[in-house]
Amino acid sequence: MRGCTLLLFSEAPFLREQEVAVITAYRNVFIQDDPGMHFRWVIRNAEGQRRWRCRNSEPDAGKVLNTRLASDGPLRQ
């Protein structure tokens, strides 16, 4: 993502309020299995194939999400 500014997030588990900021900022980040408080982050490539998925409640969800966004997360224009 040369020439882009990364929007990084907390390295701790994510809260519901942070979900909106992430899916608003990145065009290939989606929410899956959303029954309320617990959900999964999904990053898809340009062809729609899943590149990565994790639960928001995992201890290092934010750390791994930031790493994946650095390589696979184009910002919305």
Swiss-Prot record:
SUPFAM superfamilies: YcfA/nrd intein domain (SSF54786). Gene3D superfamilies: ykff protein like domains. InterPro entries: DUF905, YkfF-like_sf. It comes from the Bacteria. Belongs to the UPF0401 family. This is UPF0401 protein c0279. It comes from Escherichia coli O6:H1 (strain CFT073 / ATCC 700928 / UPEC).
